[in-house]
Design a protein with these regions (language model features):
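Aromatic, loop-rich ligand-recognition surfaces of beta-strand-rich domains
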Residues: 19-42
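Short, low-complexity N-terminal tether/leader segments at secretion or assembly junctions of large
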Residues: 66-69, 104-118
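Short, intrinsically disordered N-terminal pre-domain segments
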Residues: 1-14, 113-118
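Noncatalytic modules at the cell exterior or secretory-pathway interfaces
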Residues: 25-33, 86-107
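Residue-level recognition of conserved beta-strand positions in structured domain cores
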Residues: 33, 46-48, 98, 112
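Short Trp-Ser/Thr-centered turn/loop motifs at beta-strand boundaries
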Residues: 11-23, 49
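Exposed aromatic-hydrophobic patches
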Residues: 17-21, 79-87
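Non-cytosolic beta-sandwich-type ligand-binding/adhesion modules
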Residues: 35-80
Length: 118
């Protein structure tokens, strides 16, 4: 498993976009989100991009991965610890975007653990 810290105690009252992770092949992953001091319900978007993995950085559009629990494109950060996992992920690129929505305080940390398959 590879482990990457994507956000480390960043402000939850402004938009945050993580660095892109080049996964390059079929992947299983888990995202761990820790929050502290939120006074609203920020929205977390897990996004993929199918730009060629040989590119130094992705081009083209980022597409949100649907939250299958409620058929929207985001996950509401309404708890202090949240884990989201995906099996058989096939996009080349991965990133996380957090929108503050109605939140004006607190911090967010996000880490990613993933395993690739040939």
């Amino acid at each position: 498993m590879r482990n990457v810290t994507l956000l480390n105690n960043v402000a939850a009252d402004v938009q945050q976009i993580t660095a892109e992770v080049n996964m390059d092949q079929r992947t299983e992953w888990k995202v761990y989100i820790n929050t502290a001091g939120l006074n609203g319900r920020p929205q977390l978007y897990i996004e993929d991009n199918n730009s060629p993995s040989k590119n130094e950085t992705p081009t083209g559009d980022w597409n949100p991965i649907c939250n299958t629990c409620n058929d929207v494109d985001y996950f509401t950060l309404d708890d202090t610890v949240i884990t989201i996992e995906k099996k058989d992920f096939k996009a080349n690129w991965f990133r996380i975007r957090v929108e503050p929505t109605d939140n004006t305080a607190g911090t967010i940390s996000v880490s990613l653990s993933y395993k690739t398959f040939p």
